[in-house]
């Protein structure tokens, strides 16, 4: 016990000496301070990072989207083509048409075709101005060949807007008192026939012999809610054998007769890559207007149109670019969803 006591006493003395030594060599260099504000997170840094990310993410998305977009977007995509360029029509959505969010998502990659007459006498919006330019170019092209009065409208893709263009171009000419006949040659779809209410009798009924006189299926413009000098032949009954029906001699006879009665005969044909009807109409036509839809046709398909032109598969072929979204370009401003641009002068059209 004595030894244990001496051991503990020794340890106590050593501990006292150690405490005295440590206290002697320790001193406060900087007194401790405190702050009511947190050290982290720093709000300024967070806002700076958020601003940078908010700027960079949209830029990256736009860059990727633009580089992944392989469709025709404007006139510059057609600059290397050999096909004569007739004109362009800007993208247009009716004031009455208000697409829902679901419709905008559904048709994001495939623009909705406007199925209405936008050309009207005296209107000064950007679309009417574009059709005036198109009409002027068309008349200038036809001017040296006045006998070329039968024109077909076609495209590579469905939904290119050729029916809409053919109808409004016909209206533009009719306002100038040119007699124009628009024939709905798409015996499977019949978009143009909607202009006259899609009646039950039309071109197919004449070609199969059920209607003897072509004038019985001819709808006068002033009687159909259009204008004078603008007449329409609808498709009538949709036949089970459209292509075979076109081989009848009555088709050539009808076109020859209408050529004598009208200044221009427009034929709205199906897309050439869908059915074989268009080459049949082309035999009796003088000119071909090819419609390219901006945002729909792939740029990789443009050489196919050039090949058709070089190989002379279609007579006197020209091209129209439809649905261009102009932003500060030749038409002055972007046009869409009911926005109009007015000029300070008037037209009788």
Question: What is each PLM-predicted segment?
Answer:
Residues 1-36:
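Non-transmembrane alpha-helical coiled-coil
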Residues 29, 89, 233:
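Hydrophobic residues at beta-strand termini and immediately following loops
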Residues 42-179, 185-204, 208-215, 220-224, ...:
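Short boundary/hinge segments that flank catalytic cores
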Residues 45, 231, 263, 286, ...:
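Conserved acidic residues
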Residues 182, 232, 267, 290, ...:
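Structural beta-sheet core signal
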Residues 204-207, 232-277:
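Switch II (G3) loop of P-loop NTPases
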Residues 257-260, 274-295:
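Inter-motif core of Ras-like GTPase G domains
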């Amino acid at each position: 016990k004595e030894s244990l006591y001496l051991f503990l006493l020794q340890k106590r003395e050593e501990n006292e000496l150690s405490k005295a030594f440590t206290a002697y060599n320790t001193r406060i260099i900087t007194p401790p301070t405190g702050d009511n504000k947190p050290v982290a997170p720093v709000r300024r840094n967070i806002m700076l990072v958020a601003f940078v990310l908010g700027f960079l993410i949209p830029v990256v998305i736009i860059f990727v989207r633009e580089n992944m977009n392989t469709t025709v977007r404007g006139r510059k995509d057609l600059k290397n083509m050999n096909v004569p360029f007739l004109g362009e029509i800007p993208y247009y959505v009716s004031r009455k048409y208000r697409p829902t969010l679901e419709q905008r998502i559904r048709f994001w990659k495939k623009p909705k075709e406007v199925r209405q007459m936008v050309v009207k006498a005296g209107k000064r919006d950007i679309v009417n101005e574009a059709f005036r330019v198109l009409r002027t170019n068309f008349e200038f092209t036809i001017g040296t060949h006045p006998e070329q009065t039968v024109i077909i409208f076609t495209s590579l893709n469905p939904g290119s807007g050729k029916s809409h263009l053919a109808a409004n171009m016909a209206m533009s000419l009719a306002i100038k008192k040119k007699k124009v006949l628009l024939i709905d040659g798409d015996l499977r779809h019949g978009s143009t026939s909607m202009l006259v209410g899609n009646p039950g009798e039309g071109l197919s009924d004449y070609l199969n012999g059920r209607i003897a006189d072509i004038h019985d299926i001819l709808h006068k413009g002033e009687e159909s809610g259009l204008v004078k000098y603008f007449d329409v032949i609808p498709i009538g009954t949709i036949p089970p054998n459209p292509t075979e029906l076109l081989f009848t001699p009555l088709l050539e006879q009808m076109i020859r007769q209408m050529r004598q009665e009208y200044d221009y005969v427009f034929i709205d044909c199906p897309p050439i890559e869908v059915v074989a009807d268009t080459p049949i109409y082309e035999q009796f036509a003088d000119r071909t207007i090819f419609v390219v839809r901006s945002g729909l046709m792939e740029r990789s398909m443009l050489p196919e149109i050039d090949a058709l032109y070089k190989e002379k598969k279609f007579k006197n072929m020209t091209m129209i670019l439809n649905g261009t979204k102009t932003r500060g370009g030749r038409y002055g401003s972007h046009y869409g969803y009911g926005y109009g641009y007015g000029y300070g002068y008037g037209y009788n059209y």
